[in-house]
Every structure is written in structure tokens, then in C-alpha cells.
């Protein structure tokens, strides 16, 4: 009876979201715990089975760091971003485009899905431009541009490739590597790639899996539903700060550029994606334009 009740409660959501696109940024604990990996793969397969088009964009920072350490390649960070020279970029491509991407693809396929792994270099899926980091320290006479190597931002997304895959019942799994005008590879923040893919696809939802239970008030209570304006107010008054800011800016940009809702959800919870999409309660914070 309990199973029947769960399925019955999910039916209106299945009907509402059939045929819609959901972009999921997969990272954090959900990528490290074996049980959470399996629950995520099952969630994605089930979404596809009920007619939703999931698109997975994944990170892999810890795995990159581990291999660089094993290879005795020193990592340096500027404003939280890994300085990526040519040697480091080779490692990034091996880890993201090879190890991590293929593990996710295999896991989804093992649970009955049909996943295909891509990097942004495949069919020019993600065109990139070099990211400029500017040091505006008051000690400097003028702003200083810091070269952080092969770190980029999204210039454009080839939606035709993704459309072709989703129409053929395939689940795209995208590694956040872009290609520059000269053919060079660029390492791009996975949240940013997920957000730009969601915007380009006019997705119904952008879901960012995190290691937190959602956005919290100053009283440490999870804020389950916010408008873009309310989020901007929370940034302004310092409630949202630090490492969460880049994720929130991606989520805000998405809802301001055609995505219906963005979700900051707790990837430490089993079946977090299904709970967020198919239940009233959810497992995080929903952000809408208004």
C-alpha cells in the first residue's frame, strides 16, 4: 500500500514534466558514496522512463587533485580556481573525459539506461573562451590580469547535438571541458556548464547537487522556496556568501534566462533528484524567477 501511495502522489508531477528537460549538475558526496552513486543512476534512468529528458553535467575536482598528487604535479589556486597549464590540462582531460565520465555512463547503463559520454569538444558541444581573472587589490595602481592558463567560460552550447541525443532516447553525460577558437581545451566550472546548458536548452529545471541541505537563513533554517529577487536580497545582506555564491549565481542566471526553476539540493540524500521533482516537500531550495 505504501508503494502505491508513493506512486499515486508522484503521478501529477510525472504528467507535468513528461517531455521536459532537466539538467543535473552531479558532484560532491553523491559522486563519492557507492550507495548514492547507485541511487543517482536509478533516478536518472527512471526520469527517462517516465518521459523526462535528463542531461547530466558532472564535476571531478577531487579526482583531478588525486591524480595530480600521484603524478607529483603541484596544484595552485587563484580565487578558488585551479591554475591549469598544458600539463595539468592533460590530466584534467584524462580524469574528466575518461575516468569520471565513463564511470557515470557505465553506472547509468548498468541500471537500464542508455547513456552516452561527451566532453564539450565533441561536435563543438561547448565552445569556450579563456577566463580572465582580474586582481583589483587596492595596493595596485591599476587592475592586474592574472593568467590562470586553460581555464575557460562558456561562449556557446551546441543544442542540436543534445537535441539529437535526447530525441533518440539517449541520456547525455557531459564533462565540463570546452573547446576554444584555436582548438585548445579549457577546464570550465561544472556548475557554470550545467547552468549554460540549461539556459540554451530552455530546460524546465536546473538541479545542482551539493553537500548542503539547501540555502539557509541566518537562523540556520532551510529556505525551501525563493524568488530571484529574494535570493539577490540574501546575497546583498550577506546571508549567502563564500563558496555557495558561484552556485547561486549560476542558479539565478538560469531562471533569468529561460529556465523555469533552479534547485539547490542535498546530494547526500538517497534519491534526492526524485524527491525534489516528484514530491511536495523536496530536499533543498527551489528558486524561481518570480
From Swiss-Prot:
Alphabetically ordered keywords of this record: Amino-acid biosynthesis, Arginine biosynthesis, ATP-binding, Cytoplasm, Kinase, Nucleotide-binding, Transferase
Pathway note: Amino-acid biosynthesis; L-arginine biosynthesis; N(2)-acetyl-L-ornithine from L-glutamate: step 2/4
EC number from the UniProt entry: 2.7.2.8
EC class name: transferase
UniProt cross-references to Gene3D superfamilies, sorted A to Z: Acetylglutamate kinase-like (3.40.1160.10)
UniProt family annotation: Belongs to the acetylglutamate kinase family. ArgB subfamily.
HAMAP family for the chain: ArgB (MF_00082)
NCBIfam families for this protein: argB (TIGR00761)
Protein name: Acetylglutamate kinase
Amino acid at each position: 500500500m505504501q508503494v502505491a501511495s508513493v506512486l499515486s502522489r508522484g503521478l501529477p508531477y510525472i504528467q507535468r514534466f513528461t517531455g521536459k528537460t532537466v539538467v543535473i549538475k552531479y558532484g560532491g558526496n553523491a559522486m563519492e558514496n557507492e550507495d548514492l552513486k547507485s541511487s543517482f543512476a536509478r533516478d536518472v534512468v527512471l526520469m527517462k522512463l517516465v518521459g523526462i529528458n535528463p542531461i547530466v553535467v558532472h564535476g571531478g575536482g577531487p579526482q583531478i587533485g588525486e591524480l595530480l598528487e600521484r603524478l607529483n604535479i603541484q596544484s595552485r589556486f587563484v580565487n578558488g580556481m585551479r591554475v591549469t597549464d598544458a600539463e595539468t590540462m592533460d590530466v584534467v582531460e584524462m580524469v574528466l573525459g575518461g575516468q569520471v565520465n565513463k564511470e557515470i555512463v557505465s553506472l547509468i547503463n548498468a541500471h537500464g539506461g542508455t547513456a552516452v559520454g561527451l566532453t564539450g569538444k565533441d561536435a563543438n558541444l561547448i565552445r569556450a573562451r579563456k577566463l580572465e581573472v582580474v586582481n583589483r587589490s587596492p595596493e595596485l595602481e591599476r587592475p592586474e590580469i592574472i593568467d590562470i592558463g586553460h581555464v575557460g567560460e562558456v561562449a556557446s552550447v551546441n543544442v542540436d547535438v543534445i537535441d539529437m541525443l535526447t530525441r533518440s532516447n539517449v541520456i547525455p553525460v557531459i564533462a565540463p571541458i570546452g573547446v576554444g577558437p584555436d582548438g585548445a581545451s579549457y577546464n570550465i566550472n561544472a556548475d557554470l556548464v550545467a547552468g549554460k546548458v540549461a539556459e540554451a536548452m530552455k530546460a524546465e529545471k536546473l538541479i545542482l547537487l551539493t553537500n548542503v541541505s539547501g540555502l539557509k537563513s541566518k537562523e540556520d533554517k532551510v529556505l525551501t522556496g525563493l524568488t530571484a529577487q529574494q535570493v539577490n536580497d540574501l546575497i546583498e545582506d550577506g546571508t549567502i556568501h563564500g563558496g555557495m555564491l558561484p552556485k547561486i549565481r549560476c542558479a539565478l542566471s538560469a531562471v533569468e534566462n529561460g529556465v523555469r526553476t533552479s534547485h539547490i539540493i542535498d546530494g547526500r540524500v538517497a534519491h534526492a533528484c526524485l524527491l525534489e521533482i516528484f514530491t511536495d516537500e523536496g530536499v533543498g531550495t527551489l528558486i524561481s524567477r518570480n
